[in-house]
Amino acid sequence: AIAGLTPPKESKAFAKXEKN
């Protein structure tokens, strides 16, 4: 996920979801 598009908290959750 792109940090600029998502808030810090959601960024971590989205990053994991997208990677997996």
UniProtKB/Swiss-Prot annotation:
Biased composition (Basic and acidic residues): 9-20
GO BP terms: photosynthesis
Record region (Disordered): 1-20
Annotated family: Belongs to the PsaF family.
Described purpose of this protein according to its UniProt entry: Probably participates in efficiency of electron transfer from plastocyanin to P700 (or cytochrome c553 in algae and cyanobacteria). This plastocyanin-docking protein contributes to the specific association of plastocyanin to PSI.
The keyword Chloroplast is annotated on this UniProt entry: yes
Protein name: Photosystem I reaction center subunit III
First-listed, main subcellular location of the protein, grouped into a coarse class: plastid
Organism name: Zea mays (Maize)
Swiss-Prot/TrEMBL keywords: Chloroplast, Photosynthesis, Photosystem I, Plastid, Thylakoid
Compartment(s): Plastid, Chloroplast thylakoid lumen
